[in-house]
Amino acid sequence: MEKGDTHILVFPFPSQGHINPLLQLSKRLIAKGIKVSLVTTLHVSNHLQLQGAYSNSVKIEVISDGSEDRLETDTMRQTLDRFRQKMTKNLEDFLQKAMVSSNPPKFILYDSTMPWVLEVAKEFGLDRAPFYTQSCALNSINYHVLHGQLKLPPETPTISLPSMPLLRPSDLPAYDFDPASTDTIIDLLTSQYSNIQDANLLFCNTFDKLEGEIIQWMETLGRPVKTVGPTVPSAYLDKRVENDKHYGLSLFKPNEDVCLKWLDSKPSGSVLYVSYGSLVEMGEEQLKELALGIKETGKFFLWVVRDTEAEKLPPNFVESVAEKGLVVSWCSQLEVLAHPSVGCFFTHCGWNSTLEALCLGVPVVAFPQWADQVTNAKFLEDVWKVGKRVKRNEQRLASKEEVRSCIWEVMEGERASEFKSNSMEWKKWAKEAVDEGGSSDKNIEEFVAMLKQT
């Protein structure tokens, strides 16, 4: 790294869904002349696959996260406390050397779930900003929980928040998936807003057209808000960032060739793509209902079932659907969603998957499991109007009939053309946001100009 180059640190939370958005923003900053050092853990660095110019442009700085000291008996709070303590100390040690190097960093951009990074940055006189990997709608909900203006679970049948549609309790993020850790999870997610008054900027992985009113509300919190999303590889949007077709980090090995060859043989818009992310674990009864519902649609389908989940499928399921379905352990989701054969995405509604569906113009069947997925599903169905949300019964089970009905309605029903038309509109608006002169591109340009002036 040459002396005098404008240099920043990027510090993501060490999980795939948090690293990839910050990596994508880093690529756009590099394309505009900024030098980036990515601070991460050894485990993550071993899985990074930066291609072309980015393999040289992003300097990887590895620090310990304390995971080697973790005990199996540790609670989530104990694990997070150790992570914070270890990472704080190691970040301080790293910065003591970096700040006296020939080209010290001017700025640190960090994952919002690690607000303690801001305090370390202040110690060293570094300008700083949190990066929110989630939607601004979730930011609003968590902020109001932090300040005691909203309780989880809520005490009223409807919830009214500034610049948000009217919400029901079933639209709020579900943080009770691990009852023993609910309080810890809520503390972690609401702490993202505990010290924002000391941040220079707030970066959000969204775009103005998608969440404009909520973004305006965030700006009332007193710090400038920079929307820089969607953080999807440029090849699928504006194509202005060279050699940017993949995120650069995958903790799973995709069956890319198998999936794409199979899709090539199917008619346009005929395939249902099913994936519920890298973390969700589904109960055996629910997975069985899901499998039967998918099978009974008679649709071609590509289903990602991780190896750890495959044993929950009904006996001989894979063999029984061989003519219609392909079941794989992982795939390149962007490649699949961009394929013309795919007509619907059955998704858990993680924010990255939500953005990918919108960016690639694919209607959805929303099947959220926990956390922000629930709120994302609400917006996909009722605000952005690109699909249907699966309903559960009193036992919190989605029946095979409900699964089949939702898939059929999105792909063949009366509103199928509406869902597709709306999806294509969002695809256009997402591309416009990151293209030259778009809202997100302008925000990135302004940030780069600010860095070069200081």
UniProtKB/Swiss-Prot annotation:
Mutation effect (L109I): In UGTMG1; increases catalytic efficiency more than 10000-fold for the 3-OH glycosylation of mogrol, and acquired ability to convert the generated mogroside I-E to mogroside II-E via 24-OH glycosylation
Biotechnology: S.cerevisiae missing EXG1 but transformed to express S.grosvenorii optimized UGT74AC1 (UGTMG1) and UGT94-289-3 (UGTMS1-M7) cultured with mogrol and glucose accumulates mogrosides I-E, II-E, III-A and IV-A as a result of mogrol multi-glycosylation.
Record keyword NAD present: no
Reported impact of T79Y: In UGTMG1; increases catalytic efficiency more than 10000-fold for the 3-OH glycosylation of mogrol, and acquired ability to convert the generated mogroside I-E to mogroside II-E via 24-OH glycosylation
Catalysed reactions listed for this entry: mogrol + UDP-alpha-D-glucose = mogroside IE + UDP + H(+)
Residues at which an anthocyanidin binds: H18, H144, A371
Activity across pH: Optimum pH is 7.
SS bonds (residue pairs): C259-C331
Entry protein name: Mogroside I-E synthase
